[in-house]
Amino acid sequence: MNDIDIINSQFNTTLPLEITPELRAGFPSPAEEYLHDSLDFNRDLINHPEATFYGRVTGDSMTDAGINDGDIAVIDKAREPHNGSIVVAFVNKEFTIKYLDTTHKDQGYIELRPANPKYKPIRIGPDDEFEVWGVVIFTIKPWN
């Protein structure tokens, strides 16, 4: 079940880049001048920098959600989880990344659902040690 390793988020998030205002996915645009700017992940992508952490995904339990072995999950601990959120949960002393399913809450349990039919949901009952540690807001993935 241990399919995410938390990474220290204390690093410089500013990258000096030459970027264009838009990247067209259809026909190429005429040559445009490059803008000299910087991309700061905390400023441009993260709403709660002080509550955001990164985790390296290991395993294949979330492949049908597009989350693969080696991806880096960006986790916001300040975001409120809801039914269907992809969360990082701490279950019985281990971290895992799964869909949160609260539809059985009135029956005394919730489930953490994988996105791969090879795996079964994890049923969380009142006797389990459980905490939603944060909500996955996006992933960073290698393409090569």
Residue ranges and their predicted role:
Residues 70-71, 85:
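Structural motif
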Residues 64-65, 73-74:
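Charged, well-structured alpha/beta interaction segments
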Residues 83-106:
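Short, compositionally biased
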Residues 1-63, 83, 94-95, 109, ...:
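Short, positionally conserved secondary-structure boundary motifs
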